[in-house]
Amino acid sequence: RTANGVDKFIAISNFIARRIYKVYRRESVTIYPPVYVDDFSISHLKEDFYFTSSRMVPYKKIDLIVETFTKSFPNKKLIVIGDGPEFKKIKDLAGKNVTLLGYQKFDILKDHLSRAKAFIFAAEEDFGISPLEAQASGTPVIAFGKGGALETIRGLDDDDPTGLFFTEQTVDNLTKAISLFEKNVDKISAESCVVNAQRFSDSRFRNEFKKLVDDEYKEWKLNI
């Protein structure tokens, strides 16, 4: 009954729009959240390390990323920024090739995002801002192919790819995705990543949200 009283549903992704329809049988309009893409800077001199950052809680799957690099890629470097209740567990999983930096200030995060070879994103998110912050830094994303990531990252089948996906949250599947990325890294340009990230800018959000409110207000005025 409460849902029937809602004038307009706004979803943060098409993924959530489908969920709204499934639960409430109501259509919604998708307005992606604002990403402050201009706060990040591009670096064309990528260094030979992979990167991830997140609050260390179970659904973020940082343990999966660390375990994958420890077991499958002992000669590849992974740097992790973030803290949380799973930090000790993840530290115990980490091999010598994995560096855990814990919580860091934004400038340190920004620096690593711009220099990384790729950003690893293993969570299923309703939207997911971190992959777009990586792309705003000119950095490709290797992401779990479910949820909002499918709308914010352009896979290898796109004319201007910005990353690629893995289909299962397992060490084996992520291992295959990283190996595939290594073979196709030259197909992904920093410029394509930045252009894609700009589609989700904070100015775009303000314009879309204002237009929605203005349109709804005009319609309401016509009906009173």
Feature-to-residue mapping (PLM):
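Short hydrophobic beta-strand element within catalytic cores of glycosyltransferases
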Residues: 140-145, 150-153
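Short alpha-helical donor nucleotide-sugar binding micro-motif in glycosyltransferases
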Residues: 111-116, 135, 209
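Acidic donor-binding loop of glycosyltransferase active sites
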Residues: 114-126, 139
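A charged, aromatic-enriched C-terminal amphipathic alpha-helix characteristic of glycosyltransferases
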Residues: 169, 183-223
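Nucleotide-activated donor-binding/catalytic signature segment of Leloir-type glycosyltransferases, i.e.
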Residues: 88-110
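Conserved donor-binding/catalytic core segment of Leloir-type glycosyltransferases
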Residues: 10, 35, 41-60, 65-73, ...
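Donor nucleotide-sugar binding/catalytic pocket of nucleotide-sugar-dependent glycosyltransferases
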Residues: 1-40
